[in-house]
Amino acid sequence: MKQYLQVTKPGIIFGNLISVIGGFLLASKGSLDVPLFILTMAGVSLVVASGCVFNNYIDRDIDCIMERTKNRALVKGLIAPGVSLWYATALGIAGIALLYFAANPLAALLAVLGFIVYVGVYSLYMKRHSVYGTLVGSLSGAAPPVIGYCAVSGQFDSGALILLAIFSLWQMPHSYAIAIFRFKDYQAANIPVLPVVKGIPVAKLHITLYILAFMVPTLMLFLGGYAGYKYLVVATAVSVWWLGMALSGYKAAVDDSLWARKLFMFSIVTITCLSVMMSVDFQPEAEPAVLVSMLP
């Protein structure tokens, strides 16, 4: 049974749940619906797990080439490919059904869209054929906090849009950092990530620009009245520090692999801090502009 847990990538599920909590509690504004919270977390976990299993199935031919993925269950034959497809399908159906019936149709729809982008667009095609695969994948990576938010609100409003911008822009430097310190793996597997296609100096520039872009929606969460001054202080501090770390990569004597690994680790600190602060420093009086509503 251990291999069936590992193939769902528990670390990725856990990381996504942190962002789900942030979005859910931000929308709750201090009024926590515990059953809805638990069921939303479970639903998102199942959908993310499904996407990860499908990704493992799709990537099994290149996972055997890459050092960090060569011991995955499907590569080593611990799970039959056909069984993994049934397993992934069951997880996905269960997760989407749970979000639909326990939360609302909008939360389920967002989960479906995120799943399609990750599995159908990114994993099946963009990852192997385009340098823009990371950009497309970032949209699916930003879905969980938006699902958490919309599970409460029942509508896609300006707050949900800001969350989508924050988490999708965060994904870019986070992912490029991985591609730099895992450069040889991606090169060996012929995956066209930016550092491999355009070079590490170009990737460093993109990382810096994306962090600058990321800082804008993080501030919008405060300026839009969704989060308070404590959030602002923490968000500003971690964003500026992250930017400083990115700029340190331009030093002549820098070890690119070590620098990228540190940048990657701090990206996790950054998004965790933001998720925690938007959970605890929400503004009850926030009145977002409604973009899409599925509530009667």
UniProtKB/Swiss-Prot annotation:
The chain crosses the membrane at residues 7-27, 34-54, 73-93, 106-125, 131-151, 161-181, 207-227, 232-252, 263-283. It is found in: Cell inner membrane. GO terms for biological process: heme O biosynthetic process. Gene3D superfamilies: UbiA prenyltransferase. GO terms for cellular component: plasma membrane. Keywords: Cell inner membrane, Cell membrane, Heme biosynthesis, Membrane, Transferase, Transmembrane, Transmembrane helix. One of its GO terms (molecular function) is protoheme IX farnesyltransferase activity. Carbon 2 of the heme B porphyrin ring is defined according to the Fischer nomenclature. This is Protoheme IX farnesyltransferase. It comes from Aeromonas hydrophila subsp. hydrophila (strain ATCC 7966 / DSM 30187 / BCRC 13018 / CCUG 14551 / JCM 1027 / KCTC 2358 / NCIMB 9240 / NCTC 8049). The lineage of its organism: Bacteria, Pseudomonadati, Pseudomonadota, Gammaproteobacteria, Aeromonadales. The gene is cyoE.
